[in-house]
């Protein structure tokens, strides 16, 4: 599925590689920015979408963070630009489902994706989990 089918791709003039930079770019708090974290679970990759201000307890998942090279290989996107729409299993923090809109990676350092978290679940693109 194309990113445009899930939300609005916002082109930026300056690169955004961190939650803080993304929040500044759209003029919102860091709590409105989400990050997509890719983990390696014994050679199988998964992605977790969570609020930019939250940390993912990778050890409790029995996984490890994917290396930048693994992220690119597994998703086709660089670290910092990974969107929430992927060809690997995606899990979204259920606390995000109450948000009208959030902003996440848009596929590169010069774009963000504005989307409704609930749409990912309704379209079968992500499974809600308690993180």
Placement of each model-derived feature along the sequence:
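Extended, low-hydrophobicity, polar/charged segments
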Residues: 1-131
């Amino acid at each position: 599925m194309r990113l445009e089918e899930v939300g609005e791709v916002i082109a930026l003039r300056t690169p955004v590689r961190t939650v803080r930079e993304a929040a500044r770019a759209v003029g919102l708090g860091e709590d409105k920015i989400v990050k997509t974290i890719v983990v390696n679970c014994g050679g199988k990759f998964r992605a977790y979408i969570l609020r930019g201000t939250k940390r993912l307890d990778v050890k409790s998942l029995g996984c490890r963070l994917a290396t930048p090279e693994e992220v690119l290989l597994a998703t086709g996107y660089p670290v910092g630009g990974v969107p929430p729409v992927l060809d690997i299993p995606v899990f979204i923090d259920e606390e995000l489902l109450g948000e009208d809109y959030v902003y996440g990676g848009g596929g590169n350092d010069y774009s963000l994706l504005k989307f409704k978290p609930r749409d990912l679940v309704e379209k079968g693109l992500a499974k809600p989990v308690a993180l």
